[in-house]
Amino acid sequence: MIRISDAAQAHFAKLLANQEEGTQIRVFVINPGTPNAECGVSYCPPDAVEATDTALKFDLLTAYVDELSAPYLEDAEIDFVTDQLGSQLTLKAPNAKMRKVADDAPLMERVEYMLQSQINPQLAGHGGRVSLMEITEDGYAILQFGGGCNGCSMVDVTLKEGIEKQLLNEFPELKGVRDLTEHQRGEHSYY
């Protein structure tokens, strides 16, 4: 479910040494499955452990996950990274905003999941997003851009060189992608 690197475990163990005996960590998601989902880590004293929690035992600590957060923390990674600027704890949870779909789920669900978990986070850096409107009978994913992507002069490159390549690589049953957006250049446009 969650991978915690050795460096992160050592960091947590150091912090836990200063807490009440038996205190561990809790990993959670607030607003799971929504665009506003946020992940966090907190101390979990022994009296805060719930019967429905999942206990994930690691070499140096135990991480508790509540029942509601568990499916959204699938494939999550916690690391403690040190570089020239200092050190920081990172928590990557690709499924926090949308629950991972099964490999045998309908194509529409699998494409939507990839858009939300992999492509939209990249577009968000420019204030943009893309939505799946439909998949045609002849195998084309019909997309609609919004935010900074609407009217952006680079949208064709983003569509063909970025999104289409990723989708066709992941879903060979697709023939291509088409843009349904009526692009209107404005102050919201990124380029």
Curated annotation (Swiss-Prot):
Keyword Metal-binding found: yes
Listed name of the protein: Fe/S biogenesis protein NfuA
Binding site for [4Fe-4S] cluster: 149, 152
Gene: nfuA
UniProt keywords, alphabetically: 4Fe-4S, Iron, Iron-sulfur, Metal-binding, Stress response
Taxonomic source organism: Escherichia coli (strain K12)
Domain writeup: Consits of two domains, an N-terminal domain that resembles the so-called Fe/S A-type scaffold, and a C-terminal domain that shares sequence identity with Nfu-type scaffold proteins. Both domains are important for NfuA to fulfill its function in vivo. The N-terminal domain does not possess the three conserved cysteine residues thought to act as Fe/S cluster ligands in A-type scaffold proteins, but may keep the ability to interact with apoproteins.
Family membership: Belongs to the NfuA family.
One GO term describing the cellular component: cytosol
